Amino acid sequence: MSSGRIVQIIGAVIDVEFPRDQVPNVYEALKVQGAETTLEVQQQLGDGVVRTIAMGSTEGLKRGLDVNSTGKAISVPVGKATLGRIMDVLGNPIDEAGPIGEEEQWEIHRAAPSYAEQAGGNDLLETGIKVIDLVCPFAKGGKVGLFGGAGVGKTVNMMELIRNIAIEHSGYSVFAGVGERTREGNDFYHEMKDSNVLDKVALVYGQMNEPPGNRLRVALTGLTMAEKFRDEGRDVLLFVDNIYRYTLAGTEVSALLGRMPSAVGYQPTLAEEMGVLQERITSTKKGSITSIQAVYVPADDLTDPSPATTFAHLDATVVLSRDIASLGIYPAVDPLDSTSRQLDPNVIGQEHYETARGVQYVLQRYKELKDIIAILGMDELSEDDKLLVARARKIQRFLSQPFFVAEVFTGAPGKYVSLKDTIAGFSGILKGDYDHLPEQAFYMVGGIDEAIEKAKKL
């Protein structure tokens, strides 16, 4: 246990001088004496000086203060004691409910599982959300990205998925709030409490107001807790909101450490940092981690380096569209942009595959006809095209669905729709079984039976 002293403080970056024969390793955690602050070594500058990044506020620190090395990386509580608790990046409880009382602590920097340990599977994970189950089905043990600009519903979709999967799937979940609003973290906690699933969720928060080092590491803290559950032989869910803020924190840290920026000002190590996190989120022969990650898309530009780097790691992408949200269709998932590796007849079956592709074909054709309709009007279309447009508008409305987590705002009770009902409903619309029903009947309902009931009242 070596000790040194602070020689320079620039914002969140602190240089500490140690005796030359006792220089701590990179990623080692240091504690400032007489303060709550934890530092993480990022660089060794030579002459016994290390450059560190602070995990908390640097207010009140000054040169000359003593710093002790802990001899290991940041370690956090793991295991069942973390369930139902809110913790920070260091694993300290922040829910005012006493100490965690864990039996074990793990370091947050760990090696990803080797090729030999990894396991893949094709089991589907039903979400109860029609549009997702139909066009971009999730795999158990897969990685899913929720892409969307500001205010199109990433967090609400994420909360609905957690509620549905936690209640139906009844496994353990870990939620990592990375650089998001404190208000959302609070809403989320109460939503979980009201749904009686809090005792199955471990919450780790590093909110927007935290220093960049904190936001960069909080995703690893949550992941470490999920890895523990996986290694115990469980199927665990890992939710990360928001992966873009993880990248952004990396950009801030990179700039503070004086590295040259790369494209659009991002850190030169963007792909490597993303890989370090994503390669650990994987399923092994012991258990699985199914991860759902919200990805903020800056200025709605999917080609921005941050979302573009994330795409490469995912099995399914759910793209939320501002155009669809502006039509009042929620969840605002774009069925033409969203993709999944599971959308294969050998995995999901022929009927599901043909229905999903049929829905996409009808919507794509409608998109192409919109220009003609705008210029010449509906009357100029052929009879076949008129029928196709009518079905497309029904499909578009039937892709909307009332959410449980939005009941407070909409006043409409939430709906969980099984995969079987989803396929039956869309298959019926495509075949023309419901051509006689008005399109309003399909808006904001659960299964097709509800649409038929609603049509009787119109």
From Swiss-Prot:
SUPFAM superfamilies: C-terminal domain of alpha and beta subunits of F1 ATP synthase, N-terminal domain of alpha and beta subunits of F1 ATP synthase, P-loop containing nucleoside triphosphate hydrolases. Pfam families: ATP-synt_ab, ATP-synt_ab_N, ATP-synt_VA_C. It comes from the Bacteria. GO terms for molecular function: ATP binding; ATP hydrolysis activity; proton-transporting ATP synthase activity, rotational mechanism. GO terms for cellular component: plasma membrane; proton-transporting ATP synthase complex. CDD domains: ATP-synt_F1_beta_C, ATP-synt_F1_beta_N, F1-ATPase_beta_CD. Its main location: membrane. It is a peripheral membrane protein. Its EC number is 7.1.2.2. Gene3D superfamilies: 2.40.10.170, Bovine Mitochondrial F1-atpase, Atp Synthase Beta Chain, Chain D, domain 3 (1.10.1140.10), P-loop containing nucleotide triphosphate hydrolases (3.40.50.300). Keywords: ATP synthesis, ATP-binding, Cell inner membrane, Cell membrane, CF(1), Hydrogen ion transport, Ion transport, Membrane, Nucleotide-binding, Translocase, Transport. ATP binds at residues 148-155. It is found in: Cell inner membrane. It catalyses: ATP + H2O + 4 H(+)(in) = ADP + phosphate + 5 H(+)(out). SMART domains: AAA. The keyword Transport applies. Produces ATP from ADP in the presence of a proton gradient across the membrane. The catalytic sites are hosted primarily by the beta subunits. Belongs to the ATPase alpha/beta chains family. F-type ATPases have 2 components, CF(1) - the catalytic core - and CF(0) - the membrane proton channel. CF(1) has five subunits: alpha(3), beta(3), gamma(1), delta(1), epsilon(1). CF(0) has three main subunits: a(1), b(2) and c(9-12). The alpha and beta chains form an alternating ring which encloses part of the gamma chain. CF(1) is attached to CF(0) by a central stalk formed by the gamma and epsilon chains, while a peripheral stalk is formed by the delta and b chains. NCBIfam families: atpD. This is ATP synthase subunit beta. It comes from Ectopseudomonas mendocina (strain ymp). The gene is atpD.
